[in-house]
Amino acid sequence: MTALWVIVLCGALSIVYAIWATSSVLAADQGNARMQEIAGAVREGAQAYLKRQYMTIAIVGVVIFALLAYFLGILVAIGFAIGAILSGAAGFIGMNVSVRANVRTAQAATTSLAGGLELAFKAGAITGLLVAGLALLGVTLYFIYLIHFAGLQANSRTVVDALVALGFGASLISIFARLGGGIFTKGADVGGDLVGKVEAGIPEDDPRNPATIADNVGDNVGDCAGMAADLFETYAVTAVATMVLAAIFFGSATPDQLQSVMTLPLAIGGICILTSIAGTFFVKLGASQSIMGALYKGLIATGVLSLVGVGVVIHQLIGFGPLPGVSYTGLALFECGIVGLAVTGLIIWITEYYTGTDFRPVKSIAQASVTGHGTNVIQGLAISMESTALPAIVIIAGILITYSLAGLFGIAIATTTMLALAGMIVALDAFGPVTDNAGGIAEMAGLPKEVRKSTDALDAVGNTTKAVTKGYAIGSAGLGALVLFAAYNEDLKFFIAQKSPYFVGVAPDFSLNNPYVVVGLLFGGLLPYLFGAMGMTAVGRAAGAIVEEVRRQFREKPGIMKGTDKPDYGKAVDLLTKAAIKEMIIPSLLPVLSPIFVYFAIYAIAGGGAAGKSAAFSAVGAMLLGVIVTGLFVAISMTSGGGAWDNAKKYIEDGHHGGKGSDAHKAAVTGDTVGDPYKDTAGPAVNPMIKITNIVALLLLAILAH
């Protein structure tokens, strides 16, 4: 029991760090009146959007809460509410810091690059540590409540279902935040670029463009609030799925041993919060003035400290010796943890290779832009497809090594360790929107060239960190979903062995010569494509509306271009808020309803009865794998491809192939316009979609068993 309270203490420390860092960020200078005015507009827009988004989610949430309470009892419904509320809180607080840090970063950059870096990173670290801390506290405190105050057995079904529902609550927020935020940010970006850069020939973040404020609002709601919700969900879901597997695999152990093994994923999360906090103090500009180097110092320090920490935790909780009822040792689990950290490092490195301006892929797209728009798009698509190969091979190796060391539980521990670094990784990601906004504010407020140089350098790195963290989010989501699939499979076996009334006579057959399995695989495989298509279409529609609006303002107020009239920024923000909220509902329900639809459709087609149930459970299981396989590739190709397109444009803007305004630059802007919704809307939203499908299947089992 003491172990659980120590974990709570670790979670509480992350909140203490966040409070300390927030006060230090808010104490910084906010710059001149013009800068504060711009930042105020961005802040207002972001808050208005989030308020509306959360109200929409709340309506859906109340319905689901009532359904869960009816089918699975109030404890499970409360778990769902905890997951949703905490996930929403992490994104909301993080974004509120981010929209206050942007102007302070721009001001700090007027004195030194190091000052700007320190402020922007600190703002990011607040979001990062809140994500890890609140996710850990939510799962741990509810687990403590269930086993100590509600008096339930650690592996009882109510505990398992309540924790799965907590993951589902986080998932629901994350798919809405990712999709809605993505539609908003890219509608503004693409629409603003098409009229501003291409038609009117004005630079990015020019105050004359009516869509600029909306674009800066979008960075915060998409990359800060959206990413926070996404990784909060993966963190919570993986911890829960690992606990579910522990409850099943170690069912024969003594209650104390069982509790120790079930606490293990939480303890790994706890120690890694401490290592992430320590890691933030390593982020300092060195003699080389490399910003990416400074950030990587923090990441590497966190990784090395985590390696030691995870070893200590496993040794203290379960020892390195043999474990009860299974064939592997505690040492093997530690080795799986090492593999998890290695996979994290490799995926980050590979993503940087595909999206950084120093490497072949981005340079090849820039080179292709010289010959025109078509060749830019062709090369970009080629890179987006190529970028899936190496991450997939790394994930394959990770699965094979950990499975040979400690079976399915080994894969789960590796994934847990990978996710335990989420605090540091989200910090790198949330650094992005702060620097992006700082650059926008510096441009709009007309700050001197040398300040723009500093903010541009920070922003370029921010773009890379955003891409890199997306790679990590997808890899961990794929592995997390695999752990959830294992939980589905083991849960199914458990209910059949327990002879639950509904499961009598059920014998699922996952062999590939079962046509229902093939049908399930194909159905699961189509979901990420359909979902991605809905996301891309939504951005296209939103961008179209913005193009019309910006053209209207230029037409009706000719003084805008001369600088005598002020554009109406609020109109674009309002238009996008409505569009994003409307467009996010239907795609978000796709992964929630699919498993239920497949189950009952196949059950009816296969003739009902025990045979129908067997066919339906096999089809749903296969569907989950189908979603994981294609989802992983769709998400990686979209995020890496989109990131490469974006940075190819930046590479040309840095003075290669004719620089800004050249024909190559115009072609690169086209590529970037395609890459934007790829990397910031459809790609990242596939993550939560993969996990929701798996979680709904787990809850479906629980509901049928009741």
Swiss-Prot record:
Residues reported in the UniProt entry to bind Ca(2+): D646, D672, D676
UniProt binding sites for Mg(2+) 2: N216, D219, D436
EC number(s) on file: 7.1.3.1
Marked site (Important for ion transport) residue numbers: R178, D223, D230, D680, K691
Binding site for substrate: K186, K679
Chief location bin: membrane
Annotated site, Determinant of potassium independence, chain positions: K466
Enzyme type, top EC level: translocase
Record field: catalytic activity: diphosphate + H2O + H(+)(in) = 2 phosphate + 2 H(+)(out)
Gene Ontology cellular-component terms listed: plasma membrane
Keywords: Calcium, Cell inner membrane, Cell membrane, Hydrogen ion transport, Ion transport, Magnesium, Membrane, Metal-binding, Translocase, Transmembrane, Transmembrane helix, Transport
Entry binding sites for Mg(2+) 1: D189, D193
Cellular compartments annotated: Cell inner membrane
Membrane topology annotation: Multi-pass membrane protein
Transmembrane segments: 1-21, 62-82, 83-103, 129-149, 164-184, 231-251, 263-283, 300-320, 330-350, 393-413, 414-434, 467-487, 516-536, 585-605, 616-636, 685-705
UniProt-recorded Gene Ontology molecular function terms: diphosphate hydrolysis-driven proton transmembrane transporter activity; inorganic diphosphate phosphatase activity; magnesium ion binding
Names of the cofactor(s): Mg(2+)
NCBIfam families associated with the record: PRK00733.1-2 (NF001951), PRK00733.3-5 (NF001960), V_PPase (TIGR01104)
Family the entry assigns: Belongs to the H(+)-translocating pyrophosphatase (TC 3.A.10) family. K(+)-insensitive subfamily.
Subunit structure: Homodimer.
Biological role stated in the UniProt entry: Proton pump that utilizes the energy of pyrophosphate hydrolysis as the driving force for proton movement across the membrane. Generates a proton motive force.
Protein known as: K(+)-insensitive pyrophosphate-energized proton pump
Natural source organism: Rhodopseudomonas palustris (strain ATCC BAA-98 / CGA009)
